[in-house]
Amino acid sequence: MQPPPRKVKPAQEVKLRFLEQLSILQTRQQREADLLEDIRSYSKQRAAIEREYGQALQKLAGPFLKREGQRSGEADSRTVFGAWRCLLDATVAGGQTRLQASDRYRDLAGGTGRSAKEQVLRKGTESLQQAQAEVLQSVRELSRSRKLYGQRQRVWALAQEKAADVQARLNRSDHGIFHSRTSLQKLSTKLSAQSAQYSQQLRAARNEYLLNLVATNAHLAHYYQEELPALLKVLVSELSEYLRDPLTLLGHTELEAAEMILEHARHGGKATSQVNWEQDVKLFLQGPGVFSPTPPQQFQPAGADQVCGLEWGAGGMAGESGLEKEVQRWTSRAARDYKIQHHGHRVLQRLEQRRQQAPGREAPGVEQRLQEVRENIRRAQVSQVKGAARLALLQEAGLDVQRWLKPAMTQAQDEVEQERRLSEARLSQRDLSPTAEDAELSDFDECEEAGELFEEPAPPALATRPLPCPAHVVFGYQAGREDELTITEGEWLEVIEEGDADEWVKARNQHGEAGFVPERYLNFPDLSLPESCHGIDNPSGGEPTAFLARALYSYTGQSEEELSFPEGALIRLLPRAQDGVDDGFWRGEFGGHVGVFPSLLVEELLGPPGPPELSDPEQMLPSPSPPSFSPPAPTCALDGSTAPALPSDKVLDCPGPLDMMVPRLRPMRPPPPPPAKAPDPGHPDPLT
């Protein structure tokens, strides 16, 4: 059976796509800057040689035509590149009539530079990187929630399987020699309670995953439909202003200077006047496919879970998932975003008026304030889009969203109207109160200082394990690559770092050999039990007891009773008598040999709660073999009309802001094959 195709982490895919977008955009901006520099260089040379006649002028235009032919630009006359080529052709045709335009070309050469273009590019790139970082953060939150959901589903499925196995044995009265029917009934009741608890945890994790999924879809749609075109509009429209004036001047100069090439000059001027950012952006987006929206992402059920929608608790009321609280929270957020946008637009109008009337020394401060208000409005729009997607999904799940949404929006509209009247009253008394305008503009600052703008709910903490940590091999595995490690059932490993792909970790065996092993073939004692079960296995309530030790130094036994081991070896500690005296020597097992060794030469590793000598052998039942490998479960669509999203995956490696440098691609590893047999009864799973 062939393994499933390799998967790429969603954040890495999004990050690479964003890097491609920035690279293409910067390449385009560089081409436009080169074009601007070409116009400037062309004008300077044209002013210097304008007094020469036809042949000299044709020699001047020839290199530019050749250079334009080598440039991979657009031939459409509605773009700046097409208009530039038309003007070059007109220059060749009217070379002998350019004497009188020398002064005008000299002025054009001095007024056209690339510093303004570089400033526009820097500002637009910063805005684009910030928007991309927010999208990437949403994808990271989606990956974390999906990983938690997958963990909860695996724990629930394992509990269901064990409960069914015990119940089947109870029905067959197959309690064996070491168990009685009463002990099997108690164990069945315990496993049923655990299964119900894990089912509730699975429902909460699934609901959180679904909410983050639709929010990420909405955020991605908003980015591709609103933010990206707006940023391109700023970049291209300002560039069009810088290019349109010199190109128009060139065209008018041609018309005024030459009667012989009047038709050519008019054609160049018409082509220049047709240049606009909308058509330029449209043609630019039709070229590369990087800026096209990603396809909608579908919900991917984990394992045997086939529930594809939000789920209420038992009894018809919202249970621990808190769906009604989610409705109340996001309706309040929608009302707040509505107020922020309306207030922000009113503040923008006041700032625009102040910028027109402000003296030169105050203009930079007003411009900075304008950028801050626009950024707050944009963030409110993003929050509104994500909240609307969540509310739509909650309404599809059967919750009465309008019950909370209508009162919240009505109250928000009333507050907006009240603020508008108060603002008009302040402005009408400007002569009597000079600070009325400042009070109007400070309302937005008060909202920002409150610290409640755009607060996203913190995602639930995932179960993490400190590295390095011990692990018990449940199934053997034969290495298939040079960087993988062969493991045998029953041995102990030390996990030293996360793997380079999903379902793989890097571990070191007792002989100091390190390599990648399948994560599902290992049992991590320190994470196998929930907190609610600790009190059952460790009634004394003491600190966890170490059952594994790492050798800090190599040691050679001085007698047959002593144990020899190399540096870095993992030694399994054997139980000691509870009332024994610690003489500085411990008893352990390494490499199939049992013996004593000095305790000062090793470092204890914490194991599961409760010492080994307190384990109840009657509670140890053989675990059934895990399910065989199956292809990925079919996906189900949440909403056909929702925005696109990216495939979910495990939690990402980089929680920080978006790094715009090219990342180091890590090799992808296919999922491990299914285990060959069931675990050893001597090493039962902690759930039983």
Curated annotation (Swiss-Prot):
Residues 466-527, 544-607 form the SH3 domain. Residues 607-688 are annotated as: Disordered. GO terms for cellular component: cell projection; cytoplasmic vesicle; cytosol; perikaryon; protein-containing complex. Residues 12-280 form the F-BAR domain. It is found in: Cytoplasm; Perikaryon; Cell projection; Cytoplasmic vesicle. The keyword Cytoplasm applies. PROSITE patterns: F_BAR, SH3. SMART domains: FCH, SH3. It comes from the Eukaryota. Disulfide bonds: none annotated. One of its GO terms (biological process) is response to hydrogen peroxide. GO terms for molecular function: lipid binding. InterPro entries: AH/BAR_dom_sf, F_BAR, FCH_dom, FCHSD_SH3_1, SH3-like_dom_sf, SH3_domain. Keywords: Cell projection, Coiled coil, Cytoplasm, Cytoplasmic vesicle, Lipid-binding, Phosphoprotein, Repeat, SH3 domain. The modification Phosphoserine is found at S442. It holds the Pfam family SH3_1. Signal peptide: none annotated. Residues 360-386 form a coiled coil. Residues 623-634, 668-678 have a biased composition (Pro residues). Promotes actin polymerization mediated by SNX9 and WASL. The F-BAR domain has an atypical, flat shape and binds preferentially to flat membranes. Upon heterologous expression, the isolated F-BAR domain is localized at the cell membrane, and causes the formation of cellular protrusions. This is F-BAR and double SH3 domains protein 1. The gene is Fchsd1.
